[in-house]
Amino acid sequence: MAETKEFKTLYNLFIDSYLQKLAQHSIPTNVTCAIHIGEVIGQFKNCALRITNKCMSNTRLSFTLMVESFIEVISLLPEKDRRAIAEEIGIDLNDVPSAVSKLEKNCNAYAEVNNIIDIQKLNIGECSAPPGQHMLLQIVNTGSAGANCGLQTILKSLNKIYVPPIIENRLPYYDPWFLVGVAIILVIFTVAICSIRRNLALKYRYGTFLYV
């Protein structure tokens, strides 16, 4: 696959911020953390799939960092959109990040499962990026069934919002997170991922990147 520019969405910005926060709080644990995928299916056009294990035993901290990252990213959206997305996900923007959210309560109801994710068939759904660009979809195992649930819920909402590359290219280069933050302040559009041209089933097992 030829080298292409990444098509930025709030999905990417959120997950990058969240992973950075997790890395800053990394504590050696005995948590078993692995992702087993028997089959990846979906509709893809110029998409890349990344599988990441990032484990920690403190589920409460995982959720706190998750909410912090979420609030940072959506704070640059119009207030109406911020509140709509937060309500859909189950996060009260009036609460402090460390508060137990509705999202966390709902996800913890499913936490009595093995922290090894065993997905026999993973349906990515639809993913499409413009010619010459690619969209990165990340699957992250935090080592907690509850936190994984929260992560998936947030990503499903944020993956619908993207940052136009033309705006990003006009800005001077700084730290990547600062650059993207300024780009979002300038303009953010909400779009539905569409114009899918092909359906396929992909076999994936224990890799790092999968390009389609």
Curated annotation (Swiss-Prot):
Alphabetical UniProt keywords: Disulfide bond, Late protein, Membrane, Transmembrane, Transmembrane helix, Viral envelope protein, Virion
PTMs per UniProt: Disulfid bonds are oxidized in the cytoplasm by OPG088 protein. Unglycosylated because produced in viral factories instead of the classic ER -Golgi route.
Chain ranges on the Intravirion side, renumbered to this chain: 197-212
Keyword match Transmembrane helix: yes
Disulphide bridges, residue numbers: 33-55, 47-127, 107-149
Membrane topology, from the record: Single-pass membrane protein
Residue spans, topological domain Virion surface: 1-175
A GO cellular component entry from the record: viral envelope
TM ranges: 176-196
Domain of life: Viruses
Record carries keyword DNA repair: no
Cellular compartments annotated: Virion membrane
Pfam families in alphabetical order: L1R_F9L
Record's subunit section: Component of the entry fusion complex (EFC) composed of OPG053, OPG076, OPG086, OPG094, OPG095, OPG099, OPG107, OPG143, OPG104, OPG147 and OPG155. Except for OPG095 and OPG052, each of the EFC proteins is required for assembly or stability of the complex.
Family under the similarity heading: Belongs to the orthopoxvirus OPG053 family.
Stated role: Component of the entry fusion complex (EFC), which consists of 11 proteins. During cell infection, this complex mediates entry of the virion core into the host cytoplasm by a two-step mechanism consisting of lipid mixing of the viral and cellular membranes and subsequent pore formation.
UniProt protein name: EFC-associated protein OPG053
Organism the protein comes from: Variola virus (isolate Human/India/Ind3/1967)
GN (gene name): OPG053
